[in-house]
């Protein structure tokens, strides 16, 4: 009550910030008459002037009003677009390292030019991050004219571009690209074998377009560079033949072999199903010994394959979660409806789907480098973002990224009408109403955009409209090449466009069609008369569409996130245009079926509703929003949980990448090698001759054998002990150290100091990279099963931190030992041989990168929900870890060895 009273008196925090920024807008507007009088040359001279002032110690905030005024005037002259006052406010919010929520059509692309220009003056690079390559290239081309005119360089990065072009793009003042490409290049840079092979400078300032899509929706999707592992894919094909013989249960307690947890995207075998699966696997020869059973340690790989195959068949649907194109399974983004070429699900899921669809099964991949978008973007010195829908996720932006959301007012009032949801008994009744609404709009000349949640639904609607003779366009993952053309025409009178989720996001739907696209089609040589005719025709269409009610949005299903629904609605009513929206739902929709309260469904059935009967009530809409909030909270927990775990990896990643940077920058690593050699020899001797020990405790024979096998150095320590009666452990350690130092000195004298320095650097880099790659594989295995510790009354996160630290320490010790072993044994005759070694390694590294893949880790799938429930004390189903162990068989009714007190079949012996 007190809070609401204070808000009424002083205004909300958002309103107070806007008032404060409006004072700067007044300053910028006051400068406009002076700036307008400058000649082109004088205006362009402002850029070097600003740079000099910054070099002299002035701050960006100090020059902001004048720099914004210069950028606005330059935009008016070069692009023919002048920034509105609200766009100036948006630019200031971005400069301050916050998120600007701006409605669709408010000119976010133009807004970004203000903070981009200002921050690029520092000369440390500005990254403008977009959701796809098309938008990156489009914005770089359009806005690049402005930046180039002002004396700043612009680059754009995209997959597969030549190395020299990418180096130039990152060296530019302003670089456009996708979140994937920036992240992928960051990982590639940290696999480079020389400083010259790296692209990026230090991550200085980034503006993320559609920031909610990248930092929220894709936060559960780590960037992974992976290469093929050694395991054959044959087992996926054999297990795939088993799964269709298992039967689905209608409920958890019903008859059958497995039941589906749709909320958690998991499949669980029943008791009967476990026995049936064992029987089928034995018949197929996949399990060799009937006495061992499915749960023996040596069969854990089969459990992993069976779990993946069950999920592939029972949960993942063709034309919903993926499409099959050119003999490959291509993932469809659940948020945008776009295909994610090159991405693959992890944990064997992608191979299981390939086996299900009968396409070639590719090998499982081994992680070479990995980072989440959360940790990637938190590395920027300053981060900001813009989107049309951020306020519903304001808490997550603040808690994860430290980014405040500021809602920017629209330039003109929004007049879109958002009608209440219409709820039907089943999908048939719902789609009948959708088709009737579409046909009505088409007859009245009102353009309509229909949002669907899957390719399957979009094609089903398309087929019905085709039969009804309604002309329409379909925009989904299968038509992505025509995306820009379809969106450009979506505002034509009577146009019907069916789009999966937010495909086409980033391009405005203009009432009457895109005038800019028509001008572009005319070409630069078009006469004024031709341009005038096109403008007149467009104005007539524009007015007709406005009179018909503007763009009408139809949602065929509510998304799990309110934000995605708001994005769809936001396509209508841009810049004060008229528009309307309505969602059509049924009790058979996923959200209603899984998450909505049971009373909604019971009430509708008790009222005796028929197929085409409809409920249109604000109370129902509120219940649906309540269900969405539950899902959003659940998904936030998953993302937060992922971040908590990845923060452990991130700390280790920073250490390794910092060491690589030091190695790449160093002229010589001799001091490093000398220090490592001392540590390795001390530890080696201590294993066989413990410090402060007596000779009866020594194992000189074992020490001699190890020195020869690992370092290639025969050393007669037993003879030495016979001839020197007063020899102690410290003297032996000193003798070994002296001998090893002499061995290295001889090697250096033979090949020359320069050759030895080059060899040391090459070996250290190669061994560190190999050790890190193997460590990542161990961390993956640890991560997959760590939450099982919760059943033994242990904190999984604390256990993960402890064991991850132990693994990391072990890896560093192994790297040290391997570096010294290799340097001691390698035989090099000339510097040319070292150069050839480095070149060979570089070629192999490039080949690995070419063969590597950008992998889509479905963190919301295998184990993610169970981890969250386990952290919160829930009783989650337990997947089996993939780590193989040679242990005696445990009976299914025996107590579980983990110490939980449960039977083995209900604990670590349960299949999820």
From Swiss-Prot:
Cofactor list: Zn(2+)
UniProt: Zn(2+) binding residues: 896, 898, 907-908
Any single GO CC term annotated in Swiss-Prot or TrEMBL for this entry: cell envelope Sec protein transport complex
SUPFAM superfamilies hit by this protein: Helical scaffold and wing domains of SecA (SSF81886), P-loop containing nucleoside triphosphate hydrolases (SSF52540), Pre-protein crosslinking domain of SecA (SSF81767)
Gene3D superfamilies associated with the record: Helical scaffold and wing domains of SecA, P-loop containing nucleotide triphosphate hydrolases, SecA, preprotein cross-linking domain
Enzyme class at the top of the EC tree: translocase
Residues that bind ATP: 87, 105-109, 508
Task performed by this protein: Part of the Sec protein translocase complex. Interacts with the SecYEG preprotein conducting channel. Has a central role in coupling the hydrolysis of ATP to the transfer of proteins into and across the cell membrane, serving both as a receptor for the preprotein-SecB complex and as an ATP-driven molecular motor driving the stepwise translocation of polypeptide chains across the membrane.
Subunit structure: Monomer and homodimer. Part of the essential Sec protein translocation apparatus which comprises SecA, SecYEG and auxiliary proteins SecDF-YajC and YidC.
Protein name, UniProt field: Protein translocase subunit SecA
Organism per entry: Xanthomonas campestris pv. campestris (strain ATCC 33913 / DSM 3586 / NCPPB 528 / LMG 568 / P 25)
């Amino acid at each position: 009550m007190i809070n609401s009273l204070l808000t009424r008196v002083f205004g909300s925090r958002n309103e107070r910030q806007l008032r404060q920024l409006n004072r700067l807008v007044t300053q910028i507007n006051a400068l406009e008459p002076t700036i307008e009088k400058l000649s082109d040359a004088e205006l362009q001279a402002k850029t070097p002037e600003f740079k000099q002032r910054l070099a002299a110690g002035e701050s960006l905030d100090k020059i902001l009003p004048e720099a914004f005024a210069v950028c606005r005037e330059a935009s008016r002259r070069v692009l023919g677009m002048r920034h509105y006052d609200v766009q100036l406010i948006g630019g200031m919010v971005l400069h301050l390292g916050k998120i600007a929520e701006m409605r669709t059509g408010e000119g976010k692309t133009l807004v970004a030019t203000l903070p981009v220009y200002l921050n690029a003056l520092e000369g440390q690079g500005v990254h403008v991050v977009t959701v796809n390559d098309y938008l990156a290239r489009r914005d770089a081309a359009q806005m690049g004219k402005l930046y180039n005119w002002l004396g700043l360089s612009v680059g754009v990065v995209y997959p597969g571009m030549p190395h020299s072009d990418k180096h130039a793009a990152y060296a530019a003042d302003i670089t456009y690209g996708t979140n994937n490409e920036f992240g992928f290049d960051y990982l590639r840079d940290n696999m480079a074998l020389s400083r010259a092979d790296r692209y990026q400078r230090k991550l200085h300032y980034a503006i993320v377009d559609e920031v909610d899509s990248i930092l929220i929706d894709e936060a559960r999707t780590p960037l992974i560079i992976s290469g093929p592992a050694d395991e054959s894919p044959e087992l996926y094909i054999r297990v795939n033949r088993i799964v269709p013989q298992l039967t689905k249960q209608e409920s958890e307690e019903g008859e059958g072999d497995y039941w589906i947890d749709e909320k958690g995207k998991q499949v669980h075998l029943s008791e009967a199903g476990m026995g049936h699966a064992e029987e089928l696997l034995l018949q197929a020869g996949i399990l060799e010994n009937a006495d061992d059973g499915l749960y023996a340690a040596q069969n854990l790989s089969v459990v992993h394959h069976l779990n993946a195959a069950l999920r592939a068949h029972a949960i993942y649907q063709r034309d919903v979660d993926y499409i099959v194109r050119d003999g490959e399974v291509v993932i469809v983004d659940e948020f945008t409806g776009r295909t994610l070429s090159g991405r693959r699900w992890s944990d064997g899921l992608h191979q299981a789907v390939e086996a299900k669809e009968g396409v070639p099964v590719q090998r499982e991949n081994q992680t070479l480098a990995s980072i989440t978008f959360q940790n990637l973007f938190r590395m920027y010195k300053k981060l900001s973002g813009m989107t049309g829908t951020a306020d519903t996720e304001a808490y997550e932006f603040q808690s994860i990224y430290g980014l405040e959301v500021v809602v920017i007012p629209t330039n003109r009032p929004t007049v879109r009408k958002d009608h209440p949801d219409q709820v039907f008994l089943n999908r048939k009744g719902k789609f009948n109403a959708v088709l009737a609404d579409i046909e009505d709009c088409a007859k009245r000349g009102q353009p309509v955009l229909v949002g669907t949640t899957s390719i399957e639904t979009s094609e089903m609607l398309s087929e019905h409209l085709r039969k009804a003779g309604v002309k329409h366009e379909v925009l989904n993952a299968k038509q992505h090449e025509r995306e820009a053309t379809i969106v450009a025409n979506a505002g034509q009178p009577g146009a019907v466009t069916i789009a999966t989720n937010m495909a086409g996001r980033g391009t405005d739907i203009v009432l009457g069609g895109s005038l800019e696209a028509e001008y572009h089609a005319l070409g630069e040589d078009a006469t004024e008369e031709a341009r005038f005719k096109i403008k007149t025709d467009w104005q007539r269409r524009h007015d007709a569409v406005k009179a018909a009610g503007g763009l009408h949005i139809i949602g065929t299903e509510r998304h799990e996130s309110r934000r995605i629904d708001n994005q769809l609605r936001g396509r209508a009513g841009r810049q004060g245009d008229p528009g309307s929206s309505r969602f059509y739902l049924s009790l058979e929709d996923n959200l209603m079926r899984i998450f909505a309260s049971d009373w909604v469904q019971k009430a509708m059935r008790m009222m005796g509703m028929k197929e085409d009967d409809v409920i249109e009530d604000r109370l129902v809409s509120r219940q649906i929003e309540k269900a969405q909030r539950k899902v959003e909270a659940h998904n936030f927990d998953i993302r937060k949980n992922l971040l908590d775990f990845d923060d452990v990896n991130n700390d280790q990643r920073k250490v390794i990448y910092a060491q690589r940077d030091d190695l790449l920058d160093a002229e010589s690593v001799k001091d490093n090698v000398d220090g490592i050699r001392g540590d390795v020899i001390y530890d080696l001797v201590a294993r066989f001759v413990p410090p402060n020990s007596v000779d009866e405790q020594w194992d000189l024979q074992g020490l001699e054998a190890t020195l020869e096998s690992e370092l290639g150095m025969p050393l007669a320590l037993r003879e030495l002990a016979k001839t020197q009666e007063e020899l102690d452990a410290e003297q032996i350690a000193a003798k070994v150290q002296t001998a090893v130092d002499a061995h290295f000195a001889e090697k250096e004298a033979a090949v020359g100091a320069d050759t030895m320095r080059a060899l040391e650097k090459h070996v250290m880099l190669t061994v560190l990279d190999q050790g890190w790659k193997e460590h990542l594989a161990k961390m993956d295995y640890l991560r997959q099963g760590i939450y099982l510790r919760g059943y033994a009354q242990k904190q999984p996160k604390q256990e993960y931190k402890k064991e991850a630290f132990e693994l990391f320490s072990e890896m560093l010790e192994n790297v040290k030992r391997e570096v010294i072993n290799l340097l001691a044994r390698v035989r090099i005759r000339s510097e040319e041989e070292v150069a050839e070694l480095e070149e060979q390694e570089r070629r192999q590294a490039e080949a690995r990168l070419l063969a590597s893949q950008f992998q889509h880790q479905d963190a919301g799938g295998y184990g993610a929900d169970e981890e969250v429930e386990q952290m919160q004390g829930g009783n989650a189903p337990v997947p089996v870890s993939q780590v193989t162990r040679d242990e005696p068989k445990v009976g299914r009714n025996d107590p579980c060895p983990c110490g939980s007190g449960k039977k083995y079949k209900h604990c670590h012996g349960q299949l999820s």
